[in-house]
Amino acid sequence: MLDFSLKNKIAIVTGGSRGIGEAIAKAFAEQGATVIVCSRKQGGVDRVAEEIKAAGGAALGIACHTGQSAAIEVLYARVKQEFGRVDVLVNNAAANPYFGPAVEITEAAFDKTFEVNVKGYFLMAQHAARMMIEQGSGSIINIASIAGFSPPPMQGVYGVTKSAVIAMTKMFAKELGGVGVRCNCIAPGLVETKFAQVLIESPEMLEHFTSRTPMGRHAQPNEIVGAAIYLASDAASYT
């Protein structure tokens, strides 16, 4: 019988203070996981953690800038001290400081986008993988984007970072699968979040995305949750 429960699993969700990350964190807790909610600001992660606990779940909010290696090391040291293991990592934190043609992006904006979306994903996965290898099990879930398959207008550099996330997912899947650690990615289309607000509010950009989506509309954060629960659960043991 398939087991979609996350009972007794320790899960880290980055970018967990809003949008897709918040929806996944709360859904994981509903399925029985203890969730470490991560984002840059302590107030945001505390709010989500408190809402999870008020609903009967288990959660801890830890502020962490995933683009900074020192902050990631502090995060994992605390997770190891308090829980001794990590069963699931959801790499969801993202940055997109620039909308416009790639030829006009500044070096600072380019660096920030890659720092969070590529380096941050890699370092978070690397630290999780080291713990999971010792355990002999674990699931790493990277939130990519359809932009990683075909960079959209005004978001070319962001799309390149998501292409890197897709390639990174394949790399870790090949390296870690033999030791019981799974790595997958979810590549959503346009999702209604604060992060994507500028796209939702632009009739031209909204049309660009929805016209290329078979369902003809954008998604809500809770519509991404089911895939994440599956990939985090033992039901996905061969995925």
Where are each of the predicted segments found?
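Active-site helix of classical SDR
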Residues: 125, 161, 169
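C-terminal substrate-recognition "lid" of short-chain dehydrogenase/reductases
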Residues: 122-125, 217-239
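Conserved glycine-rich cofactor-binding loop
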Residues: 10, 17-19
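Alpha-helical segment proximal to the catalytic Tyr-Lys
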Residues: 130, 174-178, 237
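Conserved glycine-rich Rossmann-like NAD(P)H-binding loop of the short-chain dehydrogenase/reductase
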Residues: 31-48
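Residue(s) in the substrate-gating loop at a strand-loop-helix junction
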Residues: 145
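Substrate-binding pocket helix/loop in short-chain dehydrogenase/reductase
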Residues: 100-102, 106-114, 205, 209
